[in-house]
Amino acid sequence: MTGKSGQCWDHRASVAGPAGAAGPRVARLAGMRITVLAGGVGAARFLRGLRSAAPDAEVTVVGNTGDDISLFGLHVSPDLDTVMYTLGGGIDEEQGWGRDGDTYTVLAELSAYGAGPDWFGLGDRDIATHLHRTSMLGDGLPLSAATGVLCRRWQPGVRLLPMSDDRVETQVILRDEGGRTVHFQEWWVRLHAAVPAAGFVFAGADDAAPAPGVLEAIDQADLVLFPPSNPIVSIGTILAVPGIAEAVQMKTVVGVSPIIGGAPVRGMADKCLAAVGADASAVGVGAHYGAALLDGWLVDERDKAAVDAPELAGIAVRAIPLYMTDLPAATAIARAALDLAQELNA
């Protein structure tokens, strides 16, 4: 199977037998080209597992930049940085974001001046990244080139690309009296998603172009993976950039559910799904993507009823343990995704 064929909503769902032993599997993975559409923490931890499961594969990560925000004149790219720090060994493991061992002297000094916003935690080490990125952007480098420069230090072991060099901003339409629209970070970090969302707008997406290398990475991929990222404001934002969803539809795609037992592992995927009228379940997320995008779908063992769910007709569903409690667990999940892809491609 080489992806969806015919019209964009057609899908071939034939599934071959189980993959062979570990040795042949590893041999087949050598030189395999994998493209991953990634959000932040969940994607970064999955990518560590993927790197472990397929150390010789060529992995390109297309990162969500809809969360990017300007703070104190600095261009902050939360999801790109989370992937870069995690794979480069500099992440705050407890938080899942930000730099390890960071301090907040600069933020405290800004607060003493009464300068805001004070609701977004920028650590001192993290600020160095944003200063360097902002300086490069000011010198005329596109975000993709600036990301490449930052990755020279961190050596993440993957090619990390922003979804676009153009400005795309995820905005949240609040379900309040005024129907206000706020930046996603303000809704999530400042408001803690306490005000229900009525919907989401990917401002600028219609006029954006995929960053250099993005469409090529998808077109040349043997496999596209959707990690357990937010399907609406992470993967959904990436797919909103013209040309990306169409390219993905032509490939074999395996996704990992971010919902276990009816609740997100972390984050607010349930609130986002509710805002667009989708069910916060493994079945609901799989159906949201649909057979036009997904060929295979991994759900947790407690959601094994999804394997035969009629809403997921045309998608090969497998139930496995999905909690990424440590690197071995993340590796097992990534390996299961690769095994399912090999079944689909047999």
Residue ranges and their predicted role:
Residues R266-A346:
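C-terminal functional extensions of proteins
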Residues G236-V276:
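Redox- and metal-dependent alpha/beta enzyme cores, enriched for Fe-S-associated oxidoreductases
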Residues G63-F202:
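Electropositive, gly/pro-rich neighborhoods at or near active sites that engage anionic ligands
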Residues P156-V158, Q171-E246:
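Internal active-site segments that recognize and position negatively charged phosphoryl groups
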Residues R25-G98, R190-A221, A329, A334, ...:
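N-terminal glycine-/serine-/threonine-rich phosphate-binding loop
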Residues T60-N64, V253-I259, G296-E301:
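Short internal beta-strands
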Residues S52-A57, A245-K251, G290-L293:
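Short, conserved loop/helix-junction motifs that constitute active-site signature segments
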